[in-house]
């Protein structure tokens, strides 16, 4: 199996030493991701605690906008990545995080606070463990990509279908598979981010830095999606619904 080759003269994280540029790059990725999570949490809390606003969004066809708008933004950013400017990509990321907050507000209205905290902490532990493993492992994870993408497409498709079927059994199956898929994607994405950094940092200085900046945003988007979906799947599996 082919290994990821890092340029000579750079220190590999797998060897216990850290390339300063890579560390700075990943710090930027996690800064975007963290900012996105904070924004989503703030929007979700606001929507869930403003009853008239929650009623307008989730009691009308606007709920479909809340469900599908984030997916549309992700697809647009992915397909237009090369042509979008850094500022446009940043705006899309923050807009996506805000819309995800609107969508996540429904979870605050359905599940107990204790369940939400437990699911969040569980997702955080799994995410951090897999991110660290994906970053430090000597194993080439590139072969996971095709299998994980097939699983991801299946999870998305089944989730959309279940919006109309409302099947408890299908929801359970999707959640179990989803936990596996997003756990794997976390490790795979971390190794991919490291590989992309070394690929782009060796190019023309100006063009390389511009590309790395955009890769930080897209990397944050990928990791954000892994974490949020892992959180939602765990909440669906183990969350306790509010009474009444």
Regions found by a protein language model. Give the residues of each.
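A hydrophobic alpha-helical transmembrane-helix feature that marks the membrane cores
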Residues: 1-244
